[in-house]
A protein has these predicted regions:
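Acidic beta-to-alpha connecting loop that harbors the catalytic carboxylate
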Residues: 28-31, 35-38, 97-99
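Short, solvent-exposed loop/turn and secondary-structure capping segments
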Residues: 12-17, 34-38, 104-107
């Protein structure tokens, strides 16, 4: 699962019964589907990204994690949870400077979404 459409509505996050890897991307300045604040500009409430990641890594019983910060050409924090059930992984990618912007092939960093699932 690659979640780039935004956060889930508050209380509506779901985790599949069968183990599957998940990558979630959020942009810190996104007010349409905010990854940290639960209240969006239009009044909808969204689940914080950290809650979704916590629920997935708990359900998949992930035992190890790593965290990396990228500062050039963009400021991004990647948290990767592994040693999970059936070798599945959970990866959180937080862009510290972007807003509500659909990833495009010509933008730097699109590979970050796929690397955790392909490697």
């Amino acid at each position: 699962v690659i979640n780039i459409a935004g956060m889930q509505h508050l209380g509506m996050s779901c985790i599949p019964e069968k183990p599957v890897s998940m990558v979630i991307y959020g942009a810190k300045n996104d007010t349409t589907v905010p990854p940290e604040d639960i209240l969006a500009a239009d009044g909808y409430f969204y689940e914080p990204m950290k809650n979704t990641v916590h629920d997935w890594k708990s359900k998949l019983n992930c035992k190890k994690s790593s965290k990396s910060d990228i500062s050039d050409p963009a400021e991004i924090t990647i948290e990767h949870f592994y040693d999970c059930i059936d070798d599945k992984t959970v990866t959180s990618i937080l862009d510290h400077n972007n807003d509500h912007d659909w990833p495009k092939p010509y933008k730097w960093g699109i590979n970050l979404l796929f690397d955790p699932l392909l490697n």
